[in-house]
């Protein structure tokens, strides 16, 4: 591998634009070679001020560009499969924002294609694994510092949702992060998902039941629950409490300056995910670049993307029938053992 990744960023929307700035200003060992967006004007705006970067409207043109030796995919999930297969055919490093693909069937095709290649090229963008608090909790679990992990309690709260955010998206776009976190913390697959729908907020748009309570079980019997509340209004909050045999560990929440003044006390609430996980995104992309330059990946694999897609399918089914739904997984290929 060369000493520099020349990255084609495919998708210049909110997430793609953020990664373009990250790669061009804060990440070492990589540079933006091309930006692709169906809205060419948006791609052109994204490359302004980045020497040598070209704006394109077609992903194939970027993937066929010999000057490009890595790809970062930040398009909507339904476009991922085709881009992933073409990038795998080129055998170049890939960072794919979640989801790997929108469903388990297509995600399995990606796993099979990478397995056929014979080595891992895809890193999936579950950035919470790179958050300092998540990493610290993961270390406590692996070191058995407080005995065995017994239960996990997650809260995932957003101030509001964009237009078109459906009931299924509470699982596919939001709880997907907790599914990956549970797998990351336990080192186990999730075996079942149940979703309970209780009293709903008046702030939820038509067709969306909010909040929801998601119940999860892993292979060894670790129980986890997720409160997903995407119209919480007050701000953005992602928190986890882990129950061990010999103690409790809590991460997340707001721990900024605590002020007492003029007859009041308190602090500030994090407004959004960019502020909460901005540093984690930086660590994630740097890890991908460093690993790619060694011919490796530096984070979640295509198998992780497939497994979370299967969890999401079980979660959406559980939303609809109210039952405990088994997660259906194919056998894990040796490549991901």
Swiss-Prot record:
The reaction(s) this protein catalyses: myo-inositol + NAD(+) = scyllo-inosose + NADH + H(+)
UniProt subunit comment: Homotetramer.
Molecular function GO terms recorded: inositol 2-dehydrogenase (NAD+) activity; nucleotide binding
Native species: Arthrobacter sp. (strain FB24)
Enzyme Commission number(s) of this protein: 1.1.1.18
Gene3D superfamilies: Dihydrodipicolinate Reductase, domain 2, NAD(P)-binding Rossmann-like Domain
Highest classification ranks of the organism: Bacteria, Bacillati, Actinomycetota, Actinomycetes, Micrococcales
Gene: iolG
InterPro entries linked: Gfo-Idh-MocA_inositol_DH, Gfo/Idh/MocA-like_OxRdtase_C, Gfo/Idh/MocA-like_OxRdtase_N, MI/DCI_dehydrogenase, NAD(P)-bd_dom_sf
Name assigned to this protein: Inositol 2-dehydrogenase
Keywords for the protein's UniProt record, in alphabetical order: NAD, Oxidoreductase
One example of a Gene Ontology biological process annotation: inositol catabolic process
